[in-house]
Each structure stands twice: as C-alpha cells, then as structure tokens.
UniProtKB/Swiss-Prot annotation:
Keywords annotated in UniProt: Aromatic hydrocarbons catabolism, FAD, Flavoprotein, FMN, Lipid degradation, Lipid metabolism, NAD, Oxidoreductase, Steroid metabolism
Gene (UniProt): hsaB
Catalyzed reactions: a reduced flavin + NAD(+) = an oxidized flavin + NADH + 2 H(+)
Organism: Mycobacterium tuberculosis (strain ATCC 25618 / H37Rv)
Name the record gives this protein: Flavin-dependent monooxygenase, reductase subunit HsaB
Quaternary structure (record): HsaAB monooxygenase consists of an oxygenase component HsaA and a reductase component HsaB.
Length: 187
C-alpha cells in the first residue's frame, strides 16, 4: 500500500501541468448555468468524444446531468474575468455575460476561442469527481484571427509568449511560432 498523499502537495504537484481554461455551460429549467473547468480533454475522434470532470457536489453538474447536454467554451487570454466569474460562487454567473444559444440550446459565451456542443454520453466514477464523456454534436469553426488561449499554471493565469529571440514576424503569428523549427527542434 502506498503512503498517504498530502492533498496540498498533490494539488501543488499537479499545478505544474499547464492547462487551458474552459467554461462548461447548459440551460436547465430555462436558466443558464455554467462553471470554469480545467479538467477538459479530447477523448476520441471516431466517434467524436470529449471529457470533463466536475466535482460530485457541483450544482452546475447537477443541471448538466438533468439537461443531458452541455457546451464547452474555450476561453481566450482576454477572458480572465469570465473565468473568475464562472469559478466563483456568484449565484448569477451570466450577469453581464454576452451569450447566444448553441444548436442544442446551451450557452455559447461571446468572444470564446472555440465551442464544442455536446450531449452527455456517459458518466463514470472518479473519486470525488465524475468523469463525463460527451458526444460532440457540433462545434465552432477555427477562427480566422487566432487569439491566444487562457492558460492556468501553478495556481495562476498564464499565456503563450514566444521567446524574445524568436523573429518578430513569427512572434506576431502564434501559429507560425508553434510550428517553426530550429536546430533545437525535436522533430
């Protein structure tokens, strides 16, 4: 049997892994509901599936489970306020937030980098969380202008910033920066 893991140490160590920030939304009983979520991932291309992991005591999860549908909103680096609001205990998280309904009726938050509209495919036990598989029903196009994603690392927001030694025309084009090869490239 392994030694007892200290929860703060566990959280701190896992904080070394940088994640994107999403807001998972639905509408239940005609009320928009959502929460900030870092535990989101692609699961399968065929069939198209994603997953996220809400806490078992989440009221937002209860609304998503009851509605049977949800929309994943991928946040941009300019949406820290949106992330903070949906990560709070604020009772009306949608106050002052512009959104429109997805094809399934879940909120798409204006200004998000991308959205993925899903139905709940299955729910699995994950300790103090559930692991929710979502069947992708529709999704946004890739934006022509590519804003940078909002990231979370070591308990704080962060972003993608190319090294200053990267040529200026590549620093201004995130996609070029991410696919540029140098003598140190592993590929």
């Amino acid at each position: 049997m392994s030694a007892q893991i200290d929860p703060r140490t566990f959280r701190s160590v896992l904080g070394q892994f940088c994640t994107g920030i999403t807001v998972i939304t639905t509408v239940h009983d005609d009320v928009p509901v959502g929460f900030a979520c870092q535990s989101f991932a692609a699961l399968s291309l065929e069939p198209p599936l994603v997953l996220f992991c809400p806490t078992k005591v989440s009221r937002s999860w209860q609304a998503i489970e009851a509605s049977g549908r949800f929309c994943v909103n991928v946040l941009t680096e300019k949406q820290k306020d949106v992330s903070a609001r949906f990560g709070s205990k604020e009772p009306d998280k949608f106050a002052g937030i512009d959104w429109r309904p997805s094809e399934l009726g879940s909120p798409i938050i204006e200004g998000s980098l991308a959205y993925i509209d899903c139905t709940v495919a299955s729910v699995h036990d994950g300790g103090d969380h559930f692991v929710v598989f979502g069947a992708v029903e529709s999704l946004s196009e890739v934006p022509a202008v590519k804003p940078r994603p909002l990231l979370f690392y070591r308990g704080d927001y962060t972003g993608i910033e190319p090294e200053k030694t990267t040529p200026a025309h590549w620093r201004d084009d995130l996609e070029a920066f991410l696919i540029t090869t140098t003598q140190d490239t592993w590929l």
